[in-house]
A protein has these predicted regions:
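Hydrophobic alpha-helical transmembrane segments
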Residues: 1-95, 108-217
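Active-site His/Glu-centered metal-binding helix of metallohydrolases
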Residues: 99, 103, 107
């Protein structure tokens, strides 16, 4: 049981992927032009391994934003969610949750080829993730007591309006806890997608490479 649970939880992988983007971004900030271009290219490639959006033209702020969104969302998908279902249903529960989450990641984006599979996978993931997502958002808000109120306001005023409520709550909590802005428009398959800005407080700043390290549990 312990071995199966270990493989359903992706904390180590999540940390490694986050650092793979953060490290070259931080080096790019203090490098000469040629070296900076090289490091930004490394960061864009590392980011492309963990997100579905286009990364070729991403700025450092956009890369930091996308990475933190992925880390916060996957804290729910790969850590808290499996643990909750392991407590409730044991190993089968943890495996079921991760399977639903993986299928949603593979098929959940609405394309003609996978539309039917995608709708079923996304719906199952939404149902199974209802409780874990809300628990994760509360834990994230509590992770930084200084910004607890900001995190809760972000959850209530922006997270619930995200196109995927479970993901929105978790990312909004992360934005508030770090006092940064997440969300905003992003490009998928060459098409710009309008997305809500997450983070309620007026003094919230754009995400930076250093915030990636802060977002890793």
């Amino acid at each position: 049981s312990a071995a199966v649970l270990y493989f359903t939880i992706g904390q180590k992988s999540l940390k490694q992927h986050g650092q793979a983007v953060a490290t070259p971004l931080q080096k790019a900030a203090v490098s000469s032009n040629d070296r900076k271009h090289e490091k930004l290219t490394q960061a864009r490639y590392a980011l492309s391994m963990i997100v579905s959006r286009d990364t070729q033209q991403s700025t450092p702020d956009q890369m930091a934003t996308a990475t933190i969104e992925t880390i916060t969302e996957n804290t729910h998908d790969a850590i808290i969610g499996p643990l909750v279902f392991f407590v409730l249903l044991g190993v089968p529960g943890a495996v079921l949750f991760r399977l639903a989450n993986t299928l949603d990641a593979m098929w959940g984006y609405r394309t003609p080829r996978y539309e039917l599979f995608g709708k079923c996978a996304a719906r199952m993931d939404d149902i199974l993730g209802y409780v874990p997502a809300r628990l994760t958002s509360i834990l994230m808000a509590l992770s930084n007591p200084v910004n607890f109120t900001k995190a809760m306001k972000s959850i209530l005023f922006t997270g619930r309006r995200w196109y995927s409520t479970n993901a929105g709550l978790v990312m909004a909590a992360g934005a508030g806890a770090l006092n940064i802005r997440l969300g905003g428009d992003a490009i998928y398959n060459g098409i710009s997608k309008k997305r809500l800005m997450l983070g309620h407080d007026e003094d919230a700043e754009s995400a930076q490479a250093s915030d990636i390290q802060r977002s890793i549990w």
